[in-house]
Amino acid sequence: MVNIRPDEISNIIRQQIDNYDQEVQVANIGTVLQVGDGIARVYGLDEVMAGELLQFEDKEQTVGIALNLESDNVGVVLMGDGRNILEGSSVKSTGKIAQIPVGDEFLGRVVNPLAKPIDAKGTPSVQDTRLIESYAPGIIGRQSVCEPLQTGITAIDSMIPIGRGQRELIIGDRQTGKTTVALDTIINQKGQDVVCVYVAIGQKASSVAQVVSTLEEKGALEYTIVVAANADEPATLQYIAPYTGAALAEYFMYKGKATLVIYDDLTKQAQAYRQMSLLLRRPPGREAYPGDVFYLHSRLLERAAKLNQDLGGGSMTALPIIETQAGDVSAYIPTNVISITDGQIFLSGDLFNSGIRPAINVGISVSRVGSAAQIKAMKQVAGKLKLELAQFAELEAFSQFASDLDKATQNQLARGQRLREILKQAQNSPIPVEEQTAIIYAGINGYLDEVELSQVKDFVLALREDLRNSKPEFGESILSTKKLNPDSEEILKKAISDVAQAFSL
């Protein structure tokens, strides 16, 4: 029989007690009551925050956001398809609000709304993170918009100028060139030290691929980040995509850089949010949108700002895009976003179909801020342009009914047609501001009145080429002084007369 030694046993027990790890892990765990349509109802999560990330225990480790905090359950929107989440499975609260990695390494990359690369170029090694939803800068942290953001589109830079830190809405029906205006603006930032973020919401993957290849072709991808929430992705990802874009831009803005964010388009984000809200059984309002759809967009667009020098003087310019139905700008989402932004560029389907591209309706397009940032040279030449075009449009409508017109009216019509012609522009070919100044100067001062309408385009191209190759001092003077001084005006007149001679006018 084996002798039992009590002292040995007591030593072993004492050792076990000494080595016992007393650390207790407390987790807030709930149970899935119901799941479907990208929504889960969870019971038992008593201490969850609004907007907190929740971890589901399925094969994909699906993450959700707690949006509805009700008395007996929590409504969770899923950031995945959630096909393997079962009724009765457990859910753990993470104690974190949605955040993403940020850094310079994201430049030139295509990422999803969780900032995970989807371009097969590897995972960027970044240390910094930012909350997807963060507070907009306060009044004291801002300064007035004081620098121009050149789009390279003559009609916009002359009549609807955009400044750094402004929110300018691009609005119009489908297929009127809204994305083209935004892409031209990105392409024109080459060499301007502006970081661009293009957010594609609910678009076809083929459309996003086309945008990326255009940017790559024009050498613009190196300073651009593309955030893509494609049409086949869950509504939750389409809803958070714009906030991800804003967070990526904010990282650069707070480092003192100028940034440009394009949200293409916020109509689809509002529709994704409406879908989520209706599935969560939130009460519907006008057009079945939830009551806080205004706040959805205002909290996003208020993050665009021109920071004061104490905060580094960085800026975030926002160009949200809204798609209208049959030109109806008085629908719910368009009126909301018009009231939040500092102006709008309205693109008209009728103008587009009649060959005027970019199809900007100058009558109802406006910039409420940017003119303060417009360079003086452009103000000097383009001051009368909007009025001239408005008078021309009125006369043109009248002349369709009048049989005989006096000479002055005929001259005004001829000039108006030429002004409209010089504002036409091919896509993906932005024009530098000094050349825009020269083109408008020639049009507004009647130098194109004798040129045949069919030759105006060639005349403008020849003038730009002459200034670029034979008279580079004109461009240098405009860029350095920001004014059209008498010397540069003489150079410009000489260039116009040289080109006119070549056209034997």
From Swiss-Prot:
Catalytic activity of the protein: ATP + H2O + 4 H(+)(in) = ADP + phosphate + 5 H(+)(out)
InterPro entries per the UniProt record, alphabetical: ATP_synth_asu-like_sf (IPR023366), ATP_synth_asu_C (IPR000793), ATP_synth_asu_C_sf (IPR038376), ATP_synth_F1_a_nt-bd_dom (IPR033732), ATP_synth_F1_asu (IPR005294), ATPase_a/bsu_AS (IPR020003), ATPase_F1/V1/A1_a/bsu_N (IPR004100), ATPase_F1/V1/A1_a/bsu_N_sf (IPR036121)
Keywords: ATP synthesis, ATP-binding, CF(1), Chloroplast, Hydrogen ion transport, Ion transport, Membrane, Nucleotide-binding, Plastid, Thylakoid, Translocase, Transport
Membrane topology, as annotated: Peripheral membrane protein
Enzyme class: translocase
PROSITE patterns, sorted: ATPASE_ALPHA_BETA (PS00152)
Key word Magnesium present: no
Pfam families referenced in this protein's UniProt entry, alphabetically: ATP-synt_ab, ATP-synt_ab_C, ATP-synt_ab_N
GO molecular function per UniProt: ADP binding; ATP binding; proton-transporting ATP synthase activity, rotational mechanism
Annotated SUPFAM superfamilies: C-terminal domain of alpha and beta subunits of F1 ATP synthase, N-terminal domain of alpha and beta subunits of F1 ATP synthase, P-loop containing nucleoside triphosphate hydrolases
EC number: 7.1.2.2
NCBIfam families: atpA, PRK13343.1
Record's function text: Produces ATP from ADP in the presence of a proton gradient across the membrane. The alpha chain is a regulatory subunit.
The protein, known as: ATP synthase subunit alpha, chloroplastic
Originating species: Antithamnion sp. (Red alga)
Gene encoding the protein: atpA
